[in-house]
């Protein structure tokens, strides 16, 4: 994004939405299915509110309407802290102990590769700008089907928070066993057991 090089990158809701909609328009996609995890699980809620007629379905992984503060994100971009290692450590702690170590390490490695301050900037959306609050009540599942799947091992977007979100929308949530915050990458084989039935409903 413009000005990211000077260290003030902050992912906003409007920018995030614009990137997704520009991608869809650029490829001339007609009512695609969008799936997002973590911050992606949050943005699908905004898409459901603002563009329900544009999607065939929306799938949220580890979705929650807001995030209760649990650590100081300033640690993610400081001169006296190795940003890659601390970002990787945070990601690792969000994964289930039952997920394969090789897949967990690969997921952690992705987070260790981010540019300075990028993860911190992404979390600006996740922790602050993207919080939905009472706007959740505007989501109409009859206009666009929404599916919420959350791993049982996640202190960021907990199953309880996703359940509360699902109850507000008036849908069922799917609780996934043996996975954490990154189901598709930390334990893909286990995740597909839950995803395939959802995709079969959509198609």
State the predicted function of each range.
Residues 36, 40, 44:
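Gly/Ala-rich beta-loop-alpha elbow adjacent to hydrolase catalytic centers
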Residues 1-35, 193:
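Active-site loop/oxyanion-hole signature of alpha/beta-hydrolase fold enzymes
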Residues 69-71, 84-142:
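Conserved alpha/beta-hydrolase catalytic His-Asp/Glu region
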Residues 141, 145-179, 185:
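Conserved loop-alpha-helix segment in the C-terminal half of the alpha/beta-hydrolase fold
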Residues 45-50, 55-86:
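Flexible "cap/lid" loop of the alpha/beta hydrolase fold
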Residues 24-30, 141-142, 198, 202:
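Glycine-rich phosphate-binding loop signature in dinucleotide/nucleotide-binding domains
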Residues 185-199:
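Post-His helix in hydrolase/transferase enzymes
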Residues 2-8, 69-72, 159-160:
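Conserved catalytic-core motifs of eukaryotic protein kinase domains, centered on the activation segment
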């Amino acid at each position: 994004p413009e000005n990211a090089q000077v260290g003030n990158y902050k992912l906003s809701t409007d920018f995030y939405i614009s990137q997704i909609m520009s991608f869809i328009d650029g490829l001339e996609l007609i009512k695609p299915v969008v799936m997002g995890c973590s911050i992606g699980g949050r943005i699908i809620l905004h898409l459901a509110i603002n563009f329900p007629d544009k999607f065939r379905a929306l799938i949220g992984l580890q979705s929650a309407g807001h995030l209760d503060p649990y650590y100081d994100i300033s640690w993610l971009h400081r001169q006296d802290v190795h940003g890659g290692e601390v970002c990787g450590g945070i990601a690792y702690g969000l994964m289930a102990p039952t997920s394969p170590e090789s897949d967990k390490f690969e997921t952690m490695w992705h987070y260790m590769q981010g540019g300075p301050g990028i993860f911190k900037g992404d979390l600006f959306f996740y922790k602050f700008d993207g919080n939905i609050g009472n706007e959740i009540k505007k989501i109409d599942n009859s206009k666009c089907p929404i599916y919420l799947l959350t791993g049982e091992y996640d202190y960021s977007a907990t199953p309880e928070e996703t359940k509360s979100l699902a109850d507000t929308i008036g849908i069922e949530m799917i609780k996934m066993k043996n996975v954490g915050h990154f189901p598709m990458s930390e334990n893909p084989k286990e995740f597909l057991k839950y995803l395939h039935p959802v995709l079969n409903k959509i198609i």
